[in-house]
């Protein structure tokens, strides 16, 4: 029985060592991915800023990604143009309010 335990311990050690090298490789890949995401996050459009030219480039808020909300603006010349800004849609505001309220009560 003792021999079986020694063999199992040896196998567990070998498996953990070989998987740790694989994990190191995965951690390096994950770090590169996080750095790329951070660069993308820096390039995103903040809340209340104009997103007319890039409607899918809004940043993330606390819980949800901001949505590009557009309105039609009529100039003094009578021209209609579309102006867009990054903001929180009403249903996301409601969800954030409920979550915030829940955190205050249960948190």
From Swiss-Prot:
The presence of a 'disulfide through disulfide knot' structurally defines this protein as a knottin. Disulfide bonds join 44-59, 51-68, 58-86, 70-84. GO terms for cellular component: extracellular region. Its main location: secreted. PROSITE patterns: SPIDER_CSTX. Keywords: Disulfide bond, Knottin, Secreted, Signal, Toxin. The lineage of its organism: Eukaryota, Metazoa, Ecdysozoa, Arthropoda, Chelicerata. This is U1-lycotoxin-Ls1b. It comes from the Eukaryota.
């Amino acid at each position: 029985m003792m021999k079986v335990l020694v063999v199992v311990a040896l196998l567990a050690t070998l498996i953990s060592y070989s998987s740790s090298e694989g994990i190191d490789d995965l951690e390096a890949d994950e770090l590169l991915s996080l750095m790329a995401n951070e660069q993308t996050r820096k390039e995103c459009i903040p809340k209340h800023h104009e997103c007319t030219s890039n409607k899918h480039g809004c940043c993330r808020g606390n819980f949800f990604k901001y949505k590009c909300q557009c309105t039609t603006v009529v100039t003094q010349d009578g021209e209609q143009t579309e102006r867009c800004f990054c903001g929180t849609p009403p249903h996301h505001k409601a969800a954030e309010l409920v979550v915030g309220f829940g955190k205050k009560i249960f948190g």
